[in-house]
Design a protein with these regions (language model features):
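Conserved substrate/cofactor phosphate-moiety recognition/catalytic segment
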Residues: 110-156
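Catalytic beta/alpha-barrel core
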Residues: 309-311, 331-342, 369-378, 386, ...
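Catalytic alpha/beta core domains of metabolic enzymes, predominantly
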Residues: 402-541
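NTP-dependent small-molecule kinase module
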Residues: 2-72, 76-90, 111, 115, ...
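Glycine-rich phosphate-binding loop used to anchor ATP phosphates in small-molecule kinases
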Residues: 145-187, 194, 566
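Conserved phosphate-donor/acceptor-positioning beta-strand/loop module used by diverse small-molecule
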Residues: 183-205, 231
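Phosphate/diphosphate ligand-binding glycine-rich loop within oxidoreductases
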Residues: 540-676, 808, 816
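Rossmann-fold NAD(P)-binding glycine/threonine-rich loop
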Residues: 627, 643, 777-859
Length: 888
């Protein structure tokens, strides 16, 4: 029902955060909000729970922080009074973005509403439509009490009428508003949006930075009392070096300056959508799912994975290059240190943690582990830090098993989609691995609901490295539900057991390897990987790129550099061959690890395979061969973690598995190149130029992005018709293996038969163009030198054009798009595509995450255009630096 005069929705088209609400008047006395309300952030973080005091009563106390002399065998603390585990948010639950003005809430709301097909609503705009005045003007006319009452009424109506399918922006802080938001937290995500002081200061036009800092701290403390999640909106600043050098180099190439604001918004878009994907049920954000092979395998299900451990203090001091952390790592563990002696988690410290989490998420794609070091007997402070960590929605969060059952159950009940690692590192005099102490803690972690158990023993002798297998054998032999076990010895003498640990071994960044403390990781990811080969657990393998003419391929340089960076002693070399007949010996070699397949064999190579992925089947082409050495009991090829956990070991090849990663690379390029204004909608249109194997991969990539309108141009119309018929048939039979549920909109295709033919009236102009025709002479066939009709580049919001070749980067259609870059057109070429599809191949060949930044850099470093002698990296470096978007 409509109340308080709310007649209609307050949609995103008019959303602009009003500057005329006096922020200072809304926080007349910021100091009174210093204390964080325990109802949200303390033991009663769920609004439905009663507030529990932080006392040293038996229920909360850890009488001693050292380990007990005997194993923990006491029965669990009675928990009848504890609430049930907080259920996941409904997929259609509306999301509130709350926070101080200038934090970027409106921009984030529009980004999310477009991606999730939701309404974007703004409380201030709603207030103006109801009252005819801004909040500030209304307060001056009617007084603060009446203004606050009307604000509360407006927000109540918005929440009641839009409990589903909306993004709601709120900057108000009145007590009635807080109460409404706190109640909404019971069943909905209410996200506190934070930003750095300078951005807030500029937006609110506050001259005194200290005053702005005080205002931000006070408002943050207040908003944390009525929100259940937190997101730090990292401010991007343009690098002057990139701006000037990119402009100079692009101008020399006849192009335009890269659009820095576009790049900034793209990174914010990926960061925020990634965050929402972690708090909402899977499928809530259409077509955001990763296409990369390892993304579908939980990290804890893979073998020999590494979590690179970095302290919060080193990150705050800018001692580490965040992007370099990914090389060889499967997760990043943020170790929240320096809390011994603290009496509370203050607002500034909470914001620092949120900023670091945001910065890492914005620059990397691997999951985060949030680990707080439990100080001596300061469990209340520890709980504050843990509950704050849960607000940031890390993929993993550790809990110290020295806490009592009530505390552990409370944390686990609040985890939502985060996975909890029960962690224990006892004192140096801990019992041997054969002692029941360790198994009792594993059982306790499992019984209380932890998702993993991590037990780390300070090493006392070399024998400890072998004794840890006793615990692993006991766990393996145990009955009932099992959780993954992380168990090894710490310290330099414990490195052997750490290297042999299967799941999320903590490792140290390369620059810090020489300064390890006894209680810290003493292995790097590279050292741990090398240990697996030096101990003959893994074998050096052979990889190839096959094709008719692959001597110019950049794949060997790219993959060789990646293998070396990860400590993997495999080889990767090109093999040019006129036919597939000569490849039998290579692919049947016991040391064969996989191959990239080039032209003209992407279809013919299917005859060598025993099984194809569902994507390769849909496309009808293969660009990746993977040997299978272990089959399922029924003789089929495994498609889960078993396919990856058997990598890097020599043996008879029992089957060949065919995959297509070209579509993954094209999809990644399109997602990187599409501005938020051109985000895929039901009316979006894509154009495919060509009808060969790569054109099929490009078409498939657009379908995986949710594109429902696809136009095809090919010189030979019959081939275009054949391709359209193929995908139309798959679509109508619902045989397309889409990563996301398809929208209830029929996919339409249109074939343009000649370049003189006008653009079809019932199709919008394309915002995605993929050119799949050759860019250079092939034998006696000259390069086509294809020029597109200028109308094809007429989209008022620009778009993304991808040229798949890289032998030349100066094709006519690329130059056409560069000439209109000022209208929003972004160009990409084979130097963008090759690494993107190569990341997926690297995962398939090795079972490890690809070092993406390094592989991109190596492609640019190795590239040498025909007939030109220049330092490639110097001119391509700005392009590399401007790549800010990564596929998860």
């Amino acid at each position: 029902m409509a109340t308080a005069g709310v007649k209609r929705s307050f949609v995103a088209s008019s959303m602009n955060e009003s500057d005329d609400v006096d922020q200072h008047h809304q926080l007349e006395n910021p100091t009174k909000f210093v204390r964080v309300d325990a109802r949200i952030n303390g033991y009663s973080a769920s609004p439905s729970q009663p507030q529990s005091p932080r006392t040293n009563s038996s229920r909360y106390s850890m009488a001693a922080c050292s380990r007990p002399e005997t194993p923990v065998t006491r029965p669990a603390t009675p928990i009848a009074h504890l609430p049930n585990e907080i259920p996941p948010f409904p997929a259609d639950a509306s999301i509130v973005l709350a926070g101080i003005r200038g934090a970027g809430k409106s921009t984030l709301a529009i980004i999310a509403s477009t991606a999730m097909a939701r309404r974007a609503l703004d409380c201030e705009k709603a207030f103006q439509q109801v009252t005819g005045l801004t909040s500030f003007a209304y307060k001056r006319a009617h007084g603060p009490v009446e203004c606050h009452r009307r604000q509360t009424d407006v927000l109540r109506d918005l929440l009641e009428q839009n409990s589903k399918g909306a993004l709601i922006v709120c900057s108000w802080m009145e007590r009635g508003v807080q109460t409404l938001l706190r109640d909404f937290c019971r069943t909905h995500p209410v996200v506190h949006i934070l930003r750095d002081v300078r951005a807030i200061q500029d937006h609110l036009k506050i001259e005194d930075e200290e005053k702005a800092r005080s205002l931000l701290a006070a408002s943050s403390t207040l908003f944390r009392t009525c929100t259940n999640l937190e997101f730090f909106n990292v401010t991007e600043t343009a690098d002057p070096w990139i701006e000037t050098d990119a402009a100079r180099i692009e101008t020399q190439a006849g192009g335009q300056k890269p659009p820095a604001p576009y790049l900034t918004l793209k990174r914010a878009e990926r960061h925020f959508l990634k965050f929402l994907s972690l708090i909402m049920p899977k499928g809530s954000i259409p077509f955001i799912e990763s296409a990369f092979p390892l993304a579908s395998i939980p990290t804890e299900d893979r073998r020999f994975t590494y979590a690179i451990s970095v302290s919060l203090s080193s990150l705050l001091n800018n001692e580490i290059d965040i992007e370099e952390l990914e090389t060889g790592a499967d997760a990043i563990e943020i170790v929240v240190d320096g809390i011994t002696g603290a009496t509370t988690l203050d607002s500034e410290r909470a914001a620092e943690i949120a900023r670091i989490v945001g910065s890492i998420r914005r620059s990397t794609v691997i999951p985060l582990i949030y680990h707080v070091v439990l100080p001596d007997c300061s469990e209340s402070v520890y709980m504050d830090f843990i509950m704050h960590g849960l607000r940031l929605s890390p993929e993993y969060l550790t809990v110290d098993l020295r806490l009592n059952d009530y505390q552990l159950l409370h944390i686990i009940s609040m985890k939502r989609r985060s996975k909890v690692i029960g962690h224990l590192t006892p004192a140096a005099d801990s019992p041997s691995w054969a002692d029941p102490f360790w198994m009792s803690h594993y059982h306790r972690a499992r019984r209380l609901g932890c998702d993993l158990a991590r037990l780390i023993k300070p090493v006392t002798c070399i024998k400890d490295n072998f004794d840890v297998n006793h615990l692993k054998a006991l766990v393996e032999a145990s009955t009932g539900h099992k959780i993954p076990l992380i168990a090894y010895n710490s310290g330099p003498r414990g490195r052997h057991s750490a290297a042999m640990n299967h799941v999320l071994t903590s490792v140290v960044p390369e620059p810090m390897a020489s300064n390890c403390k006894p209680d810290q990781p003493c292995l790097t990811a590279v050292q741990a990987t090398q240990a697996l080969y030096n101990s003959f657990l893994f074998d050096p393998m052979k990889m190839y790129v096959f094709g008719a003419h692959v001597s110019y391929s950049l794949s060997p340089a790219m993959h060789t550099a990646a293998l070396k960076a990860c400590g993997i002693p495999h080889s990767y070399r090109p093999v040019s061959t006129p036919s597939l007949n000569g490849l039998r010996e290579l692919i049947e070699d016991p040391y064969f690890a996989g191959a990239s397949v080039g032209l003209p064999f992407k279809v013919e190579v299917i005859t060598l395979t025993h099984s194809l992925s569902r994507h390769a089947q849909a496309i009808g082409a293969v660009n990746t061969l993977v040997p299978v050495r272990r089959l399922n009991p029924d003789g089929t090829i495994p498609e889960d973690e078993k396919l990856f956990n058997c990598r890097n070991r020599a043996g008879p090849v029992r089957a060949l598995y065919g995959e297509n990663t070209d579509w993954i690379g094209i999809r990644a390029c399109l997602r990187r190149g599409l501005s938020p204004a051109n985000a895929v909608r039901p009316t979006s249109c894509g154009l495919i130029i060509g009808a060969g194997g790569m054109a099929r991969a490009a078409t498939y990539s657009m379908l995986q992005l949710g594109v429902k309108n696809i136009v095809v141009y090919n010189r030979t119309v019959a081939n275009a018709e054949k391709m359209v018929t193929h995908f139309t048939r798959l679509s109508k039979r619902h045989d397309l293996p889409l990563l996301s549920a398809a929208l209830d909109v029929e996919t339409r295709f249109h074939i343009i038969r000649t370049l003189d033919e006008p653009w079809p009236e019932d199709f919008r102009l394309p915002t995605m163009i993929v050119s799949c025709i050759p860019t250079h002479r092939i034998g006696d066939v000259p390069a086509p030198n294809f020029f597109a009709p200028s109308s094809w580049l007429g989209s008022p919001t620009g778009g993304c054009l991808v040229e798949l070749g890289y032998k030349t980067l100066d094709t006519p259609i690329l130059n056409q798009a560069r000439q209109v870059s000022n209208r929003g057109w972004v160009t990409m070429d084979g130097l963008d595509l090759l690494p993107e599809q190569g990341f997926a191949q690297f995962e398939l060949f090795t079972g490890r995450r690809a070092p993406r930044r390094l592989m991109r850099g190596e492609v640019f470093r190795a590239y040498q255009p025909d007939g030109q002698d220049r330092a490639a990296l110097a001119q391509l470096q700005p392009r590399l630096n401007n790549i800010v978007e990564q596929e998860p």
